[in-house]
Amino acid sequence: MGRKNDIIQKIDSFIGQKIYSLRLAKGLSRQQLAEVIDVTHQQLQKYEKAINRISVGRLVLIAEALDRNIDYFFEGLEEANKPQPVHTQHQRMCIEVSRNFMKINSTEEQQAINNLVKCLAGKEKLKTNV
């Protein structure tokens, strides 16, 4: 019975992490998403940290609020059984960059930063008309 509980906990953690990461990527606070799905921000935190299990109905609401198909939350689940670090330095930096980016109120400045990142990533040439 313990093995099944371990697997269930890993699945809950996997889905919670996907919710957390996507929420940050969308620039939503925990409070903002919680209001949309009609739960408290504390309850959403419990979902993200896999303290409480998410019902399928609630997961559908979360998927809609984050503009994703529900399948998104299960993509890569097979890999979840492999041991992975909780947060690498790189992941922490990505989260910090995302949080700071969302604090920029100017759309033009956000676009300029996005262009710079694309340039540094080698995706396109730097645009200077912003």
UniProtKB/Swiss-Prot annotation:
DNA-binding region(s) from the entry: 30-49
Record keywords: DNA-binding, Transcription, Transcription regulation
Top-level taxon in the UniProt lineage: Bacteria
InterPro entries named in the record: Cro/C1-type_HTH (IPR001387), Lambda_DNA-bd_dom_sf (IPR010982)
PROSITE patterns the UniProt entry points to: HTH_CROC1 (PS50943)
Pfam families according to UniProt: HTH_3
Keyword Cell wall biogenesis/degradation: no
Gene3D superfamilies: lambda repressor-like DNA-binding domains
GO molecular function: DNA binding
Ranges of residues in domain HTH cro/C1-type: 19-73
UniProt keyword DNA-binding, yes or no: yes
Covalent S-S links between cysteines: none
PANTHER family: TRACRIPTIONAL REGULATORY PROTEIN-RELATED-RELATED, TRANSCRIPTIONAL REGULATOR
Protein name listed in UniProt: Uncharacterized HTH-type transcriptional regulator RP497
Organism, scientific name: Rickettsia prowazekii (strain Madrid E)
